[in-house]
Amino acid sequence: NDSSQIAIPILGTVRGGPLRFAQEEWLGQELVPLEETVGGEYFYLEVIGDSMTGARIYPSDLVYVKRCSMVNSGTIAVVLVNDEANLKRVFFKGSTMVLHSENPKYEDMVFSAQEIEAKDIQIIGEVLHSKIRFK
């Protein structure tokens, strides 16, 4: 057992495509260097869908997520939209939030300050990196 690594859970799946529910379910775990787990709560999600292929995130890849409720504009994040988990690049333009797919076949999703305040939109975490899985 290598004490310089820690097991991080794969909690479920996240859509990198059309809006659909992503179930939180234990899918296993991956080892991560201990220094990548400092100062926060971390988890992996398995990507389903092709909306983030332009960012080199493909179906079956694992995204490593740091749980947080805010991200900087331009960050790739896991965002709940009406209880459905989505993997998108997040932009803030004035009082609106834009969820952008890195695949031209998907349109941006734009949300008003009112929709965000109503808690229909919630940032779950920032994607720190992805891990290729060949399935």
Role assignments for model-derived ranges:
Residues 60-62, 75:
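Structural motif
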Residues 1-58, 85, 92-96, 117-121, ...:
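Short, positionally conserved secondary-structure boundary motifs
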Residues 71-78:
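Short, Lys/Arg- and Gly-enriched loop/turn segments at beta-strand edges
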Residues 12-14, 81, 101:
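Flexible glycine-/small-residue-rich
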Residues 64-65, 78:
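Hydrophobic beta-strand signal
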Residues 78-80, 107-118:
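Short aromatic-glycine motifs in intrinsically disordered, low-complexity regions
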Residues 89-105, 110:
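PDZ-domain C-terminal substructure recognizer with occasional recognition of PDZ-binding tails
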